[in-house]
Regions:
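Short hydrophobic beta-strand that contains or immediately precedes a catalytic carboxylate
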Residues: 55, 65-70
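Surface-exposed acidic loop/strand-edge motifs in secreted or periplasmic proteins
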Residues: 69-73, 78
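Bacterial N-terminal signal peptides that target proteins for export
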Residues: 1-10
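Rhodanese-like catalytic fold shared by cysteine-dependent sulfurtransferases
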Residues: 15, 20-53, 58-61, 77-80, ...
Length: 185
């Protein structure tokens, strides 16, 4: 084999191995509780799983509400007076609602209530409205949030595991995001 053919064969083997590894991640019985930035399952029982091309079609059709669940570090409570604090910027899919910190495996009661009320507001109380959950690629937070929406009785739950990483890689637009206000802020 030539050098180019050997490199090509090696790349194919790596891609197959990577796909097999990602496909082999089982769904846990409950929520993922740690190591949130890790390969995710290919499925979420009760939800539809989509790739970027389908997410783009849904976005263009305005047929769903997109929910970003990327966490956001809170402003430290013990900052001295006069200390300048800047939130880390977040760019998400245009038109999305950002409900930060709602993808952890265990939620404080106030954050659980924030998620429930935020989702209710985003869907105008329509539990049959299509809701697309996302975060970043290889991020369990969107998986957990989508699973939580199913537990709340939402019937048209869509999980977009590629998140803003896949969206940006496809050359699609992102916009600066502002999170929905949290009760503890």
């Amino acid at each position: 084999m030539t050098g180019a053919a050997t490199r090509f064969a090696f790349m194919v083997i790596l891609m197959i191995a990577a796909g097999a590894t990602a496909a082999g991640v089982p769904e846990p019985d409950g929520y993922r509780l740690q190591d949130y930035r890790a390969p995710t399952p290919a499925t979420l029982q009760g939800a539809r799983v989509i790739r970027t091309d389908e997410a783009e079609m849904i976005w263009h059709s305005h047929s769903a509400t997109f929910i970003d669940v990327l966490p956001r570090p809170p402003r430290p409570r013990d900052l001295p007076a006069g200390t300048l604090w800047r939130d880390k910027p977040r760019a998400n899919i245009p038109g999305s609602i950002w409900l930060p910190d709602t993808g952890y495996g265990e939620l404080a009661p106030s954050i659980d209530d924030y998620f429930s009320k935020g989702l209710y507001k985003a869907t105008e109380g329509d539990h049959a409205r299509t809701v697309v959950f996302y975060c970043l690629a290889d991020c369990w937070m969107s998986w957990n949030a989508a699973k939580r929406a199913l537990a709340l009785g939402y019937s048209e739950v869509v999980w977009y595991p590629e998140g803003t990483d896949g969206w940006l890689a496809a050359g699609l637009p992102l916009q600066d995001a502002t999170p929905e206000p949290r009760p503890d802020e």
